[in-house]
A protein has these predicted regions:
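Short catalytic-loop micro-motif centered on adjacent basic/acidic residues
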Residues: 82, 194-195
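Residue-level detector of conserved catalytic or cofactor/ligand-binding positions
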Residues: 202-208
Length: 208
Protein backbone atom coordinates (compact mmCIF):
# COMPACT_ATOMS: atom_id res chain seq x y z
CA UNK A 1 0.00 0.00 0.00
CA UNK A 2 1.27 3.43 -0.92
CA UNK A 3 2.10 5.53 2.15
CA UNK A 4 3.79 8.70 0.86
CA UNK A 5 2.96 11.08 -1.99
CA UNK A 6 6.57 10.92 -3.16
CA UNK A 7 6.04 7.34 -4.26
CA UNK A 8 4.04 8.63 -7.24
CA UNK A 9 7.04 10.66 -8.41
CA UNK A 10 9.56 7.91 -7.73
CA UNK A 11 7.64 5.23 -9.61
CA UNK A 12 7.04 7.52 -12.58
CA UNK A 13 10.65 8.75 -12.69
CA UNK A 14 11.81 5.13 -12.96
CA UNK A 15 9.26 4.24 -15.64
CA UNK A 16 9.44 7.29 -17.94
CA UNK A 17 12.40 9.40 -16.77
CA UNK A 18 12.72 11.55 -19.90
CA UNK A 19 9.02 12.40 -20.24
CA UNK A 20 8.15 16.01 -19.38
CA UNK A 21 6.59 16.23 -15.92
CA UNK A 22 5.90 19.97 -15.74
CA UNK A 23 6.16 22.80 -18.25
CA UNK A 24 5.90 26.55 -17.71
CA UNK A 25 6.63 29.47 -20.01
CA UNK A 26 10.37 29.21 -19.35
CA UNK A 27 11.17 25.63 -18.38
CA UNK A 28 10.42 22.02 -19.21
CA UNK A 29 11.31 19.57 -16.44
CA UNK A 30 11.34 15.81 -16.96
CA UNK A 31 10.30 13.34 -14.30
CA UNK A 32 13.98 12.46 -13.80
CA UNK A 33 14.88 16.12 -13.43
CA UNK A 34 12.01 16.76 -11.04
CA UNK A 35 13.05 13.76 -8.97
CA UNK A 36 16.66 14.96 -8.77
CA UNK A 37 15.82 18.59 -8.04
CA UNK A 38 13.28 17.83 -5.34
CA UNK A 39 15.68 15.39 -3.66
CA UNK A 40 18.40 18.03 -3.71
CA UNK A 41 16.08 20.55 -2.07
CA UNK A 42 14.99 17.92 0.45
CA UNK A 43 18.61 17.24 1.33
CA UNK A 44 19.39 20.94 1.80
CA UNK A 45 16.41 21.35 4.11
CA UNK A 46 16.95 18.07 5.93
CA UNK A 47 20.53 18.99 6.83
CA UNK A 48 19.46 22.21 8.50
CA UNK A 49 16.14 21.36 10.13
CA UNK A 50 16.31 19.54 13.45
CA UNK A 51 12.87 17.92 13.34
CA UNK A 52 10.33 16.45 10.94
CA UNK A 53 6.60 16.91 10.40
CA UNK A 54 6.93 20.68 10.73
CA UNK A 55 5.43 23.29 8.39
CA UNK A 56 7.78 24.76 5.78
CA UNK A 57 6.51 27.78 3.87
CA UNK A 58 7.14 27.95 0.12
CA UNK A 59 7.08 31.51 -1.21
CA UNK A 60 7.61 31.73 -4.96
CA UNK A 61 5.98 32.63 -8.23
CA UNK A 62 3.96 29.83 -9.85
CA UNK A 63 6.53 27.84 -11.80
CA UNK A 64 8.12 24.46 -12.37
CA UNK A 65 10.69 25.45 -9.77
CA UNK A 66 8.00 25.90 -7.15
CA UNK A 67 6.76 22.35 -7.79
CA UNK A 68 10.27 21.04 -7.10
CA UNK A 69 10.34 23.08 -3.88
CA UNK A 70 7.00 21.68 -2.70
CA UNK A 71 8.18 18.13 -3.28
CA UNK A 72 11.55 18.96 -1.74
CA UNK A 73 9.81 19.91 1.48
CA UNK A 74 8.15 16.48 1.51
CA UNK A 75 11.55 14.84 0.96
CA UNK A 76 12.85 16.65 4.04
CA UNK A 77 10.18 14.89 6.11
CA UNK A 78 8.10 18.04 6.59
CA UNK A 79 4.90 19.42 5.08
CA UNK A 80 4.62 22.39 2.77
CA UNK A 81 2.58 25.56 3.12
CA UNK A 82 2.42 27.44 -0.21
CA UNK A 83 1.87 31.18 0.04
CA UNK A 84 1.04 33.51 -2.84
CA UNK A 85 4.00 35.78 -3.61
CA UNK A 86 1.48 38.48 -4.61
CA UNK A 87 0.03 38.67 -1.09
CA UNK A 88 0.54 41.96 0.77
CA UNK A 89 3.66 41.66 2.97
CA UNK A 90 1.61 42.38 6.09
CA UNK A 91 -0.62 39.39 5.37
CA UNK A 92 2.35 37.09 4.79
CA UNK A 93 3.91 38.28 8.05
CA UNK A 94 0.68 37.64 9.94
CA UNK A 95 0.44 34.10 8.55
CA UNK A 96 4.07 33.38 9.41
CA UNK A 97 3.55 34.65 12.95
CA UNK A 98 0.52 32.39 13.30
CA UNK A 99 2.18 29.35 11.73
CA UNK A 100 5.69 29.63 13.22
CA UNK A 101 7.19 27.48 10.43
CA UNK A 102 10.41 25.53 10.65
CA UNK A 103 11.66 27.43 7.59
CA UNK A 104 10.70 29.48 4.56
CA UNK A 105 12.05 28.54 1.15
CA UNK A 106 11.82 31.20 -1.55
CA UNK A 107 12.70 31.92 -5.17
CA UNK A 108 15.05 34.66 -6.36
CA UNK A 109 12.10 36.60 -7.76
CA UNK A 110 10.78 37.24 -4.24
CA UNK A 111 14.12 37.41 -2.41
CA UNK A 112 13.57 40.96 -1.14
CA UNK A 113 10.14 40.04 0.22
CA UNK A 114 11.48 36.89 1.88
CA UNK A 115 14.38 38.79 3.46
CA UNK A 116 11.92 40.98 5.34
CA UNK A 117 10.78 37.90 7.27
CA UNK A 118 14.26 36.75 8.34
CA UNK A 119 13.45 37.40 11.99
CA UNK A 120 10.50 35.00 11.93
CA UNK A 121 12.12 31.78 10.66
CA UNK A 122 15.19 30.43 8.83
CA UNK A 123 15.29 31.27 5.11
CA UNK A 124 16.41 29.03 2.23
CA UNK A 125 16.90 29.94 -1.41
CA UNK A 126 15.35 27.49 -3.87
CA UNK A 127 18.09 28.22 -6.40
CA UNK A 128 20.87 27.51 -3.91
CA UNK A 129 19.15 24.37 -2.64
CA UNK A 130 18.92 23.07 -6.22
CA UNK A 131 22.73 22.82 -6.28
CA UNK A 132 22.72 20.36 -3.37
CA UNK A 133 23.73 16.79 -4.15
CA UNK A 134 21.00 14.42 -2.92
CA UNK A 135 21.98 12.46 0.19
CA UNK A 136 20.19 9.11 -0.01
CA UNK A 137 20.91 8.14 3.61
CA UNK A 138 19.59 11.44 4.94
CA UNK A 139 16.49 11.31 2.76
CA UNK A 140 15.80 7.77 3.91
CA UNK A 141 16.00 8.82 7.57
CA UNK A 142 13.63 11.71 6.90
CA UNK A 143 11.16 9.40 5.12
CA UNK A 144 11.12 6.99 8.05
CA UNK A 145 9.82 9.76 10.30
CA UNK A 146 6.67 10.27 8.22
CA UNK A 147 3.48 8.18 8.39
CA UNK A 148 0.68 8.20 5.83
CA UNK A 149 -1.57 9.98 8.33
CA UNK A 150 0.95 12.79 8.80
CA UNK A 151 0.46 16.13 7.04
CA UNK A 152 1.47 16.54 3.41
CA UNK A 153 0.48 20.18 3.12
CA UNK A 154 -1.45 23.02 4.70
CA UNK A 155 -3.62 25.54 2.86
CA UNK A 156 -4.83 28.74 4.48
CA UNK A 157 -8.44 29.82 4.04
CA UNK A 158 -9.19 33.24 2.58
CA UNK A 159 -9.87 34.74 5.98
CA UNK A 160 -13.05 36.39 4.73
CA UNK A 161 -14.69 35.82 8.12
CA UNK A 162 -11.65 36.73 10.20
CA UNK A 163 -8.10 35.42 10.57
CA UNK A 164 -7.20 32.82 7.89
CA UNK A 165 -7.24 29.26 9.20
CA UNK A 166 -4.79 26.55 8.22
CA UNK A 167 -6.35 23.39 6.76
CA UNK A 168 -4.05 20.37 7.04
CA UNK A 169 -4.28 17.50 4.53
CA UNK A 170 -2.50 14.18 5.11
CA UNK A 171 -0.60 11.98 2.67
CA UNK A 172 -3.33 9.34 3.05
CA UNK A 173 -6.10 11.78 2.13
CA UNK A 174 -4.32 12.89 -1.05
CA UNK A 175 -3.40 9.33 -2.02
CA UNK A 176 -6.98 8.10 -1.60
CA UNK A 177 -8.36 11.04 -3.56
CA UNK A 178 -5.77 10.73 -6.33
CA UNK A 179 -6.36 7.01 -6.81
CA UNK A 180 -10.13 7.52 -6.92
CA UNK A 181 -9.97 10.60 -9.16
CA UNK A 182 -7.65 9.12 -11.80
CA UNK A 183 -9.82 6.02 -12.06
CA UNK A 184 -13.13 7.90 -12.09
CA UNK A 185 -12.01 10.41 -14.74
CA UNK A 186 -9.96 7.88 -16.68
CA UNK A 187 -6.69 9.82 -16.66
CA UNK A 188 -3.82 8.06 -18.43
CA UNK A 189 -0.16 8.74 -19.06
CA UNK A 190 -1.04 10.15 -22.46
CA UNK A 191 -3.10 13.00 -20.99
CA UNK A 192 -1.73 16.52 -20.53
CA UNK A 193 -3.21 18.48 -17.64
CA UNK A 194 -3.22 22.26 -17.29
CA UNK A 195 -3.45 24.41 -14.21
CA UNK A 196 -4.48 28.04 -13.81
CA UNK A 197 -5.08 28.18 -10.06
CA UNK A 198 -2.52 29.57 -7.60
CA UNK A 199 -0.68 26.87 -5.67
CA UNK A 200 -2.02 28.30 -2.41
CA UNK A 201 -5.63 27.81 -3.54
CA UNK A 202 -7.22 24.51 -2.52
CA UNK A 203 -8.98 24.08 -5.88
CA UNK A 204 -5.57 23.33 -7.35
CA UNK A 205 -5.50 19.97 -5.59
CA UNK A 206 -8.92 18.84 -6.77
CA UNK A 207 -9.47 20.24 -10.26
CA UNK A 208 -6.28 19.94 -12.33
Amino acid sequence: MQKNLLEYLEKTAKRIPETPAFVDECTTLTFFGLHQQSRGIGTALGRQLASCNRPVVVLAERSVQMVAALLGVLYSGNFYVPLDSQMPPQRVEALLSQLQPAALIYSTAVEALAASFSGLCPLFSIEQALDTEPDDALLSRCRQQVLDVDPAYMIFTSGSTGMPKGIIVSHRSVIDFTDWFTEAIGITGADILGNQAPFCFCLLYTSD
